[in-house]
Each structure stands twice: as structure tokens, then as C-alpha cells.
Amino acid sequence: MKTSMTLGGIGPRLALLCLPYVILSVIVMVRYPEFFDLRFFDSSFIKVLGYVWLGLGMTFWIFSGIFFLKYFKAGKLITLGPFALCRNPIYSSIIVFIIPSLALIFHSGLIFSISLVLYIGFKISIHGESRLLRRAFGDEYNIYEKSVNEIVPFPRYLFRGKSVK
């Protein structure tokens, strides 16, 4: 059992879990482009929406990565910036923004399914990391965990009518 956090987090495990499906999906998309084609998404409006979503996702990913690299080595719980919106903003940017935006742009159900598989892999893999964070930061992490979404970058307090302190 791991006893300390690593810079890669659950990334390597998530890659091992999901990479075979991603590779298979890409092969199927290249060989049979009509397979799981979502024709009802084949419009200019949806494509533009996909590009906007992709821009948001790439911005969120870059900002999250820079923020993480800047503050990880300090050994403190990161709760500001993108980490104030969700506990796993780097994975969020990929699973919630980047891959779904590509699915919209290419009107592909297979690309959407990659996002779903990554989310399932994320849910399977994240528990060990959460345990390490609970052990390392105690009540501070428990409070953070209860006040910030795991992967959807949307402030919970907007629905509760009170701010997070």
C-alpha cells in the first residue's frame, strides 16, 4: 500500500485501466468511421459548441496543471484556484471537457464512451489517493472533501445558498 502522494497520482493506474479501451476505440473509429456516429450532432452549432467546450477544457487543464506543479511540492493540501472548483481538476478537464468536446466536434458516440470509461476508471482508482489525503491532512481534507465536488467543476455552495469558508 502506498504511503505518500506522487506527482503522477492515479494517472499511471488510470492509464493502465483505460488505455486498452481507448486504443480499441481509436482503431474502430479509424476503420469504421460510421460506427456509433451521432448524426444528430452533425451541425455547425454543435461543432462550435464543441470548440468552445474544448477551449474551456484546455484552459482549465493548463491552469490546473500549472497550479498543481506550482503547489504540489509544498506538501500542503491545494484548495485554491481550480482545486476550489473540484478536487481533481486535471482529470476533470479531460473527462468532463476535452473528450466530450471532441465527441461533439466529430459527432462520435465512441469518443463519448471513452469519457465514460475514463470516469469509471477514475472512480475505481481514486479511493487510494483519497485515503492518503485523509491520512496526511485529516480534518482539513474531510472538510474540503465535503465542500468541493470530486470531478464536476461547479461550486456546491451555489445550490446551498451559503459560501464555503
Identify the meaning behind each predicted range.
Residues 1-79, 94-165:
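Membrane-anchoring alpha-helices and their flanking helix-loop junctions
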Residues 78-89:
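Short, amphipathic, aromatic/basic-enriched membrane-interface segments that mark the entry/exit
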